[in-house]
């Protein structure tokens, strides 16, 4: 089998009940990039990548499409049933740009699953859970409002909450964490406090020092791995890496040197499902909990995150975050990813199990054959 065609689409995703706010940006709408790979057999697979604007990470929508345009001509004729070889071919065509390569990788896995008549999760090693835990990220807001939302989401069944902090006086962040804990204490809900790289080490240390009795993990409090390493032994809480986990080499370094206690990992940041499966196995070897997320996106990226999340050893699974609550229009009305009771059911069909309504996307912005 060979790749015969590659089509690239741009699609707007307005934020439902927006905006969505993190320390680095306030988001009202995002543009996702979708990739359709068509094999010479006629089978097609879908991939997606959707950065949260240009300031969250070194990735952006126009960059994804430029990178795909650079690689796509050289991928025509490649075998989509060999994801490792396909990854090496992409690396030979373009340095870096994992988030664009991920869209091709996801599409290849979708196509491969359809070819063999199995789910992507089965291709990734096998299913550990048919119903995958999710978690809810609150966004940044006033302490009382965030505490109200936290209690509401616990009542809905989410086993884990992520409280966004940063970009304001740390006193407000401390108050927010305390008020959230007052509302959810005793529920068994796990808690993460996510700085999204925004805190100076001074504020990260103070936050941890002033909340020693609250059992949260501190996720990516500071901008660089070096800053996090400097405070690692001085905080009262476990530290997870998110944005600093840029690639497998960094993950190996962080795990090997004991720089963190777990990860919040983005599927497209690390390069797709092939890379994500390797990351999962590294974490299992060192007993490091982790999530299986992405920055944003619709049903395609949500399904990919759910499939890899379903293969994670349950005791290490910190959940799958998807943007579905913030997206009004699913790509697949019947099989699209839904959160119910704080969990996501693994799609049943072959491949990703998603059949997108192509009419939503309009004509491709680029095609290669």
Curated annotation (Swiss-Prot):
Gene: hpbD
Gene3D superfamilies, per database record: Enolase-like C-terminal domain (3.20.20.120), Enolase-like, N-terminal domain (3.30.390.10)
Source species taxonomy: Bacteria, Pseudomonadati, Pseudomonadota, Alphaproteobacteria, Rhodobacterales
Example of a GO biological process term: amino-acid betaine catabolic process
Cofactor note (record): Binds 1 Mg(2+) ion per subunit.
Stored Pfam families: MR_MLE_C (PF13378), MR_MLE_N (PF02746)
Induction trigger: Up-regulated by tHyp-B and cHyp-B. Repressed by high salt concentration.
Positions contributing to Mg(2+) binding: 194, 219, 242
Name of the protein in its database record: 4-hydroxyproline betaine 2-epimerase
Molecular functions per Gene Ontology: amino-acid racemase activity; metal ion binding; racemase and epimerase activity, acting on amino acids and derivatives
Main EC class the enzyme belongs to: isomerase
Enzyme Commission number(s) of this protein: 5.1.1.22
Keyword field contains Kinase: no
Function: Catalyzes the 2-epimerization of trans-4-hydroxy-L-proline betaine (tHyp-B) to cis-4-hydroxy-D-proline betaine (cHyp-B). Is involved in a catabolic pathway that degrades tHyp-B to alpha-ketoglutarate. This pathway would permit the utilization of tHyp-B as a carbon and nitrogen source in the absence of osmotic stress, since tHyp-B functions as an osmolyte and is not catabolized when it is needed as osmoprotectant. Can also catalyze the racemization of L-proline betaine.
Phenotype seen when the gene is deleted: Cells lacking this gene grow more slowly than wild-type on tHyp-B as sole carbon source, whereas growth is normal on cHyp-B. When both hpbD and hypF are disrupted, P.denitrificans is unable to utilize tHyp-B or tHyp as sole carbon source.
Similarity field: Belongs to the mandelate racemase/muconate lactonizing enzyme family.
Residues annotated as catalytic: 164 (proton donor/acceptor), 266 (proton donor/acceptor)
Reaction equations catalysed: trans-4-hydroxy-L-proline betaine = cis-4-hydroxy-D-proline betaine; L-proline betaine = D-proline betaine
InterPro entries per the UniProt record, alphabetical: 4R-hPro_betaine_2-epimerase, DgoD-like, Enolase-like_C_sf, Enolase-like_N, Enolase_C-like, Mandelate_racemase_C, Mandelate_racemase_N_dom
SUPFAM superfamilies reported for this sequence: Enolase C-terminal domain-like (SSF51604), Enolase N-terminal domain-like (SSF54826)
Essential cofactor(s): Mg(2+)
Record key words, sorted: Isomerase, Magnesium, Metal-binding
Binding locations of substrate: 56, 162, 295
Keyword Amino-acid biosynthesis: no
